[in-house]
Amino acid sequence: MSSAPVLAHTREELATLLAAARARGEQVGLVPTMGALHEGHASLVRAARERVTDDGRMGPVVVSVFVNPLQFGANEDLDRYPRTLEADLEVCAREGADIVFAPSVDEVYPGGPPQVTVRPGPLGKILEGKVRPGHFRGVLTVVAKLFGLVRPDVAVFGQKDYQQLALIRRMVLDLALGVEIVAAETVREDDGLALSSRNRYLEPEQREQAVALSRALLAAQENAGYGAEVALDEARAELRAAPGVDLDYLVITDPDLDELPAVVPPGTPARILVAARVGGTRLIDNLPLMLGTRGPAGEASPPNRERSEPGSAEQNKSPGEARTTPSGTSEASE
């Protein structure tokens, strides 16, 4: 096991710890988290370590552990979100993090709730932003704050929170923050469920039901060569067959979360994203797609599955199910 990271609770402690590294010209890596660390977070720390190591000289990796109240809605799980700092320190030690920054709310927001925040713009109003108003304003504000406190050269985020990743990249571009954003692949359980700190809320039966999300995405990925409509049909079929899954949205977009064009050329990259509740736990997931290259054997449609055509009776979804739009995307019904 690597040596234990140094724990900093205040911005002054953090600045002192980073000063020597900056004087040596070392790069600084940041992994922002809300704690309750798991193997997905561990992979982010490893990615940060790799990016700040140059010719054997290792710059410091900072892991922030801060449950940010600004990104929780009134009826969300702020109070019960797991706080496991001692266990988090063990994960950070194992993965070679140098500093764990675990500030209080007053340390991050010394003037109380901030009066100046980062507005996410149009990209923050769709998907998660539509379901969780104000969420991304809180996320971007705290990330900008952490960038100011740590002043990292590199920051690592997971692709599981894909919309968040896209918004952070946009914020860095629009505000010229000068931080390299590294996207790390989603880490999954053996059965495909994306790792999440909220998975611990799931009862055993709900845990089994939750795998339907990744099964749906894989079904879409396997059939994306037939086009977006078929991919969505296959994903819907998996979700409909799964008990206990309450769908918020299922959507295929381009990699930047814009709508697909009306005509999708073969080999067009895309992203499928899903959000659903299993019991009282809200889960999200996503996968990349490559659209329009037809099936592996050149079939025009997938075997053993009749799919609906746009405008057919099958498109009359009940609330919460996916609905197809003319662009080939899909979003949850109101």
Curated annotation (Swiss-Prot):
Primary location class: cytoplasm
Binding-site residues, beta-alanine: Q71
Compartmental location: Cytoplasm
EC number: 6.3.2.1
UniProt-annotated stretches for the region Disordered: 288-334
Active site: H41 (proton donor)
Keyword annotations: ATP-binding, Cytoplasm, Ligase, Nucleotide-binding, Pantothenate biosynthesis
Any Pfam family: Pantoate_ligase
GO BP of this protein: pantothenate biosynthetic process
CC per GO annotation: cytosol
Catalytically driven reaction(s): (R)-pantoate + beta-alanine + ATP = (R)-pantothenate + AMP + diphosphate + H(+)
Composition-biased stretches (Polar residues): 313-334
Record keyword ATP-binding present: yes
Pathway(s) of this molecule: Cofactor biosynthesis; (R)-pantothenate biosynthesis; (R)-pantothenate from (R)-pantoate and beta-alanine: step 1/1
Molecular functions per Gene Ontology: ATP binding; pantoate-beta-alanine ligase activity
Chain sites annotated for binding ATP: 34-41, 158-161, 187, 195-198
Residues given in the record as (R)-pantoate binding sites: Q71, Q164
Subunit structure: Homodimer.
Note: The reaction proceeds by a bi uni uni bi ping pong mechanism.
Summary of the function given for this chain in its UniProt record: Catalyzes the condensation of pantoate with beta-alanine in an ATP-dependent reaction via a pantoyl-adenylate intermediate.
Matches recorded under NCBIfam families: panC (TIGR00018)
Family affiliation: Belongs to the pantothenate synthetase family.
Annotated protein name in UniProt: Pantothenate synthetase
Organism this protein belongs to: Nocardioides sp. (strain ATCC BAA-499 / JS614)
Protein encoded by which gene: panC
